[in-house]
Amino acid sequence: MYPYTNYHDALFRQPNNLVNDVEKAVNGEYSAINCYSKLANMAKNEEERQRILEIRQDEVKHFQQFQQIYVSLTGRQPQPKIVEECPAAYLNGLEFALKDEQKTVDFYMEIADTATTEHIKEVFRRAAADEQNHAVWFLYYFTKHK
């Protein structure tokens, strides 16, 4: 056996996984932006509406950062698509959002742990911290209205 195949696989697999993960992150943020617009419109009061719009603005920032990373890795613009539909009822939407944010924290930390540059690591670590904060707010509103 020649060990070179393993080195080749190790060298080229990780960046492809990174590209796929960044593309998945772009789509996730794109979906969240769409969903949080709907949730903000269903909010029970102005304070909740404003907080959800602030969360949405964080998602726009993440979306833009992830797009830039995708372009730097591939040389082309991503073609974002909605990958998860937002529930039509407010309470269901809050539950959906808090679960999605929690899963996203883990996903972004995995990307940060395996990323190839410090810039990518830092962007995803910061985004993971933001997502954790978002989950807390969604949990608060979900618990409040349940």
Language model features: what each stretch is:
Residues 1-146:
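Non-heme di-metal
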